[in-house]
Amino acid sequence: MFNKLRISLPQAGLLLLCAAWLLPGLVGHAPWKGGDGDHFVLLLQLLRDGGVLQAEPPLYYWTAAATAWLTAPFLPLHDGARLASGLFIALTLVFVLRTARALYGSEAGWAAVLLLLGCLGLLVRGHELNAHTAQFAGAAMLLHGLVRVAQGTRGGMVFAVGAALMLLAGGAAETLLFLLLAGSAPLCFEAYRGAAARRGLAVATGATLAFAAAWLAFLSAQGAPLAAMLGLDRWFAPGNLEPAYYPAMLAWFAWPAWPLAAWAVYRERRQWRTPGIALPVLLLLGLLAMYAFVAAPGEEHGLVLLLPLALLGAAGLFTLRRGAANALLWFGLMLFGFVGLLFWVYWSAHDLGMPARLAARLTRLGMTDVGTLRPWAPALGVIATLLWIGFLTRVQRSPLRPVLVWTAGLTFIWALLMALFQGPLDRRHSYVGVAEQLAAQVPADACIQTYAVRATQRQLLAYHSGRFLVPADLGCDWLLIETRQREAEPHVSPNWVKQWEGARP
């Protein structure tokens, strides 16, 4: 069905591209507002409570604690912890590579990896403290086990290990979906009806159910909230159902994988009962059906949706017509070339003050260091730009070239953004600046009670300032109040005297 093409592409170069995508932005900045900070606060809670999380799936936080401990001599806690996301993304790439090779042939493996890294939605989510990257890796392992289980017990063991990771990461519903797919595979595919497949399926289901029973028994003995620990609270959280949220999100989140996936399904529509088409399609449809009933959906939960689309996209890439391939190629070249030029213009305004009108606009946006030259930033930016240009002059014509150029361009843009603007972004999106101002006003041994300060902000301010912040009145000598734009300042006792006010840029 699929051509097992042999394309001469240096493996080391592709590995370097993966590393270039993964490393920039993973370290070198404080926890940012949003998911990055939220997950870091949960890690602080785990470290404070001795490795126990009361209402969160633990796998990611255990791993983050381990990477933070291993890198403590040379990295801050938050940077070391963020490496856990890099580990889970790398594990995901390994199993996507192996799954695509098993389904479509050797060169389809790198096509699937490049398509996954080229998806716009993974770029930010894959570089922050993000517990859902653990589910991402578990799902990739489960999918590989599901594909290989027809060959015997080794595939069944991979499936079971992936299921264990998924359960520890809070993906009980996704694990159940994979079990249903495994159970129905003999009814749909002839390859799953042999003796080796029966042994593999027996190992997969038996080991998965045994681990699930042991995990449930442990959680029950600990008195943990089962819905939260298993990730089932997503379907019961307060919020409105948005059935169309994830299909609409995939239009940009999974670009450019989804058009290639759609082409593969159309091209192989007469072969729809083969595992290479049917398994990813059934997984995608099953996930979308489940996620349609998630209360308060969000991007983080959509990472798993990228896996079947990347696999199908790899299948479609090698049959893509020349006009469509050239369109993707030139669109990537023009888009990333324009964005790269735009970044350099903004760097010139930020560091050199030229053009003056743009520099004045950046100042009005709250950037306090406009006009201050940072020599290392343009040096790193020039290196990234020259590497990208050098890559474009050497990339060879092949079926992989459109997606290779796209992913390399996206990697260049991300690396350039981190090189030129990681410092300003850190000041704007983290609480370091506010915490430093707070620490300068309050003695190190002081107690600060807070009013209307959200728990995540309070703990991040305490982490960065080294001060003791509490949520209630414990007789502290200092009071910290949060007010928001367009809201009146809350009434406080006249006994309190304002000493300082500050805000993020």
Name each region found by the language model.
Residues 1-326, 461:
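Membrane-integral, polyisoprenol-dependent glycosyltransferases
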